[in-house]
Amino acid sequence: MLQHRPLVFALAVALAVGVASPQSIAAKKHASSKSKTPAASLACTDFYAEANRSWLGANPIPKSGAVSALGQLTARAQQQQRDLLDAAMRAPQGKVQQLLGDFWASGLDEAAVEKDGAAPVAPLLQRIDAIRKTGDIAPALAALHQVGIPVAFGFNADIDLRDLDRHLGYFSQGGLGLPDPAYYTRSDADTKALVSRYADYMRKILALTGVAKKDIETQTALALDLETRIARATRPLVELRDPRNNFAPVATAGLGKQYKNLQLDAFLKAQGVSDDSVSLANPALFEQLDSLVGKLKPAQWQAYLRWRAGDAMAPYLSRPWRDAAFDFRGKVLLGQTEPAPRWQQVLDAINLAAGPMLGKEYAATYLPDASRKRAELIADQVRDALLKAIEDGPELDAAGKAEARKKLEHLRIEIGTPHRDLDFTVQPMGRG
């Protein structure tokens, strides 16, 4: 019968190890270390990557976005909008779908876009070239605002905070090509480098608009100087967090006399505004703009307007325009590595230009009454819970609770679309 002899076996193993060459032992240790180090190193240095390796491999970070639950919902909603627009393009049901379908088809026709080149922006450039004297500047500003290019300042319609059942025209700061007015006046190295790259982008756009090579530097300097003057009169972004700096109703009757060079009375008429009041929350800015219209030569305003029109239209024109815009606005400002796909750009343009129209069609298709009612029920329950918190909470005295209840009673919740109908009367645009 075979018997185990642990001691003899152990001595034999020890002897074998003892007579092995140092080189062979080192080689074995090296091979063992080489095979085990990577896994141990990854787990120790980046445990998140090691623990989530499979999920991260299956869900790579998009080149122009992020991965999140809300992002997934957004992606689904975008696909639904694409399906809706595809149907409107093939077989529109009504005038609104006809307009949306034409917009979608025209935007997706890249061959036609490339063929058109700079033709779509040509009428705007001709309008700017027609400026000869100071009195021509304000009408040119109004004309560009009419087509959605906010030069010198911003102007849009929004809810009247005094009466939520009506809309009001809002004059606001704007007209700048950089996202923060502080970029124009800061002197640190990073900001100077950014402004230098911004000026390079301006040169590209001005060249595409037809400015002669010998005039590019002069035109760029004039446009950048005017933007800097506007930026100096613009409120810092942090101040806009205060709602009182964004809403200040004024009578429209005296605006023409108060801002003679800007001709704001004629501006409002050109935008189709006939209300007796608008919001103008930064009168100092508009006083400066009015002064600049009267003080600066028309040629400087032409350079600025040509640049702003070209920049605004660049994402929708032929490839040289789009590439110039993306190189600065996509890569430099946003850190993107490649532009969004064509369908995404067209969808964004539709939402910008005709968002309420698309939204109403979307709600009619994808928001059934049962879902709307469930959402309204949840909203009502949240309101009831808030009311109970007001009543039971020790933070407010009796007067404070009464004021809170009053505000809550006036809170209106609209799910999907506004309760009142919006006017979608527009001129047909056709395709191409």
Where do the model's predicted regions map?
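Surface-exposed patches in mature extracellular/periplasmic domains of secreted proteins
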Residues: 58-63, 92-96, 209-219, 390-405, ...
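Bacterial N-terminal signal peptides
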Residues: 10-18
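Active-site-surrounding "flap" and adjacent substrate/cofactor-binding loops of secreted or lumenal enzymes
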Residues: 41-46, 50-118
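Noncatalytic, helix-rich "gating/capping" subdomain that lines the substrate-entry/channel surface
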Residues: 88-381, 418
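Extended, non-catalytic substrate-recognition/exosite surfaces adjacent to catalytic cores, especially
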Residues: 224, 369-432
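Signal peptide processing junction and immediate N-terminal pro/mature segment
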Residues: 20-30
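Bacterial N-terminal signal peptides that target proteins for export
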Residues: 1-10
